[in-house]
Amino acid sequence: MIAIWKSDIMAKGLKKIGEDMKKKQKSIKINLIMNTIKTLMSLIFPLITFPYASRILGATGIGRVNYASSIVSYFSMFAALGISTYAVREGARIRDDKEKFSKFSREMLNINLCTTFIAYCALAVFLALPILENYKKLLVISSLSIIFTTIGTEWIFTIKEEYAYITKRAILFQIISLILLFVLVKNKNDYYWYAALTVISSGGSAFFNLWHSRKIVDWKQKKERLEYRKHLKPILMIFGTSVASSIYMTMDTTMLGAFRGDKATGVYTAAVKINTIVSTLIGTISATILPRVSYYLGNNLKKEYEKLMKESVDILFMIAIPAAIGMICTSDILILIFSGKEFLTGSTAAKILSA
């Protein structure tokens, strides 16, 4: 009887483990689907907005906005400081403990607010340079994205794998931005409105996130001592490894704007936009699995980790290679459809970026 009772308990335990594993696999699939929908919308959105904006504003207007954005991106990079990546990696390990997770989230936000303040101080000094006199208003508008990204704490929802919420919110503000684009951008002088619309989505998302995060994180400061020092070294290490790639992604636009002017920057932007659409789709896979990878490693689930990594690499190769070949073969047609004849000289850059 005892043996039967023990075997029954073991059977129930194994059944529960099996059910938990199925739920985890299902949640990964749902997360991937929701994140794919979000990514597809972020791909479709510029396919509608950029062709319209490029034809209304022309290469010069687009170039002015993107030159200003490229300058602001350096200050955004410092404000971010690798905090988001670190928060996702470490926060995923303690996400089931609300008290620890809330304390961790307060520490991350406070560090991020400090780096954001320093970034704005540096930007204020930078704006005094005479060479940027004609770009001051655009730089101020674009710089709003820095504080919006900080207070948005997107990493909280990535850690919690709330991709349904992230997707719905993103689609909502993309639709709002699209409507405002058609209403406000009517001629070549409306590039200030176009610059503002590029940050409206992040601004709205930030306030939504602040409201929604109260269900997940207890933001009230407790009597316990917040630990900042232990986070600084790993955050700076991540920042050090990411700074090179971040500069690589934006230095080309900044240098082009400084040496060749707004029109050349606008033409090059069309090539970059097309390349970004494809690379964003590929990057979705990595962004989706990162919280689960951290969770598996944090709980010493090596088999699940290895299986997930193998599947992810297979999918990446399956998408990346055909995408690169397709981009090289069709860049002329894509530039013409996507941006118009004025941007057609950017097709060579599109081919090089796709390789």
Where are these regions (language model features)?
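Alpha-helical transmembrane segments of polytopic membrane transporters and translocases
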Residues: 52, 63-80, 237, 252-254, ...
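Membrane-interface junctions at transmembrane-helix termini in multi-pass inner-membrane proteins
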Residues: 147-170, 347, 352-355
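Hydrophobic alpha-helical transmembrane segments
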Residues: 67, 143, 167-215, 234, ...
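Alpha-helical transmembrane segments of multi-pass membrane transport and lipid-handling proteins
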Residues: 40, 47, 77-80, 85, ...
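Helix-terminus/linker motif at the lipid-water interface of multi-pass membrane proteins
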Residues: 44-62, 183-188, 246-277, 291-296, ...
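Helix-loop junctions and terminal segments of transmembrane helices
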Residues: 50-51, 80-96, 271, 276-313, ...
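Signature of the first transmembrane helix
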Residues: 26-84, 178, 198, 236-259
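Interhelical loop/hinge segments that connect adjacent transmembrane helices in multipass membrane
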Residues: 9-24, 28, 164-167, 191-198, ...
